[in-house]
Amino acid sequence: MTMMNEKLKKEKKKIFGVITPFQKYLYTPRIINTVHLIIMSSKGITKKKVKSLKNLDSTKKLAEKIKQQALQKQQKQQKQQEQENANHNQTESSLSSSSSTTSSSITTIDPDAELKFKTFKELNLVPDLLESIESMKFTKPTPIQSEAIPHALEGKDIIGLAQTGSGKTAAFAIPILQSLWHAQQPYFALVLAPTRELAFQIKDTFDALGSSMGLRSSCIVGGMDMMDQARDLMRKPHVIVATPGRIMDHLEHTKGFSLKNLKYLVMDEADRLLDMDFGPALDKILKVIPIKRTTYLFSATMTNKIEKLQRASLHNPVRVAVSSKYQTADNLVQSMMLVNDGYKNTILIHLLNEFMGKSIIVFTRTVAHAQRTALLARILGFNAVPLHGQLSQSQRLGSLNKFKSNQANILVATDVAARGLDIPSVDVVINYDIPTDSKAYIHRVGRTARAGRSGKSISLITQYDLEMYLRIESVLGKKLPKEDKPPKEVLDALHVHVDKATAEAIRQTKEIHDKRNGGGGRRRNRDDADREER
């Protein structure tokens, strides 16, 4: 009211000038208000607006109060979010900005030291688990098993590093099953794998090791029916083996499914799981599982990302490094062959003839090369099957099963088959296309010479591959011996037939491609996270 009177006095002074005491007496509040309304009306201000001006102070106070409350709420939410991020921030972006791991928090074990145990009986495992181990003919533990399992049984987080084919799966499955035997809790462990094939094989290992203790397991991967998987999850399996995208789909959409009581998290082939395609799904998974859990990271190689991941998600982990960063098996014979690009298919067919009857994996760089090369081999009478990311899940499993059962002795694959797959007794690996990085080379040739067997790898090097090949030699620390090429007259005679077969293979590949795409493309989604080839 005082403020309004001051405004009226100012307006009145403009009209009447200086007010005398007598005039002041005449201008009672009622008269003043009447004069004020007349003045305001002349300026286009209504009585209703005057009333709103009177309430201006109280409105401002209310707005300020609401603003303060909102600010306090926002600060509280921000504080909660910061706390949550501190506990769960395990995304790729956070890993890239975090500092490197300090060596004081990790115990690196000398791989040349004497094994901690030489038989599984020394571990005091439960009888049911020992029975399964014996039925699987596991007589002597591998180095990674000997070093990792004792620490895992003590409840420690593990970073396990070992060359492919060294028994990593059993190294984390045995401690989990030992703990499960005492708890018998549903949704006890989650194992994340980068590819569908690896997920199925991990499940097979768990099923075999847990066969005597009533283990329930489930494999949740893309390319399979969501409803069938949801029903499987409602049966409350003890162990879930999954690809990140599909398990996240179920966490978001399958009613009644939760991992809030999860005890074990395993990331197999951890470096690949940390690739960009898996980042968003991994971030969400790590936010919905308990902070208090046991975590195992297993990989064939060590990367900076894994070093940083242990700082973000593991508690006082033990690093079990059984092999160096880049190492091939001692019983693997590696060689290379310099070839003219125009004769590459001819050389390949010559090698397939040379190793007739042996189990062979031919690695290519792209899906198109894998499909075309498999067709080329089939046209020329070889039992070859393709394996790549653009096949349906049933087709991929079909190719794998044919190769593993010796119905087909040649598997033509992209790098989707290079890591983690349990393919026993591969005699020869042929790098039709040399890989673009050294790690991929290690994983490819690691498909042979497994579990103490001998093996052979041959890389076909064209004039366009020399730079990549020299990088691989630099990492290996040695030069690969050159493989002798067949005589020119033999190659020329074979080249005529291979050329015709190649043309037919290209035609059939185009037909398959057109049929698969149906004249159009398709959008990539989380279920395709393990389809890394183009």
From Swiss-Prot:
Its main location: nucleus. Its EC number is 3.6.4.13. Residues 149-320 form the Helicase ATP-binding domain. Disulfide bonds: none annotated. GO terms for molecular function: ATP binding; ATP hydrolysis activity; RNA binding; RNA helicase activity. It is found in: Nucleus. It catalyses: ATP + H2O = ADP + phosphate + H(+). Keywords: ATP-binding, Helicase, Hydrolase, Nucleotide-binding, Nucleus, Ribosome biogenesis, RNA-binding, rRNA processing. Coiled coil: none annotated. InterPro entries: DDX47/Rrp3_DEADc, DEAD/DEAH_box_helicase_dom, DEAD_box_RNA_helicase, Helicase_ATP-bd, Helicase_C-like, P-loop_NTPase, RNA-helicase_DEAD-box_CS, RNA_helicase_DEAD_Q_motif. Residues 347-492 form the Helicase C-terminal domain. Interacts with the SSU processome. This is ATP-dependent rRNA helicase RRP3. It comes from Candida albicans (strain SC5314 / ATCC MYA-2876) (Yeast). The gene is RRP3.
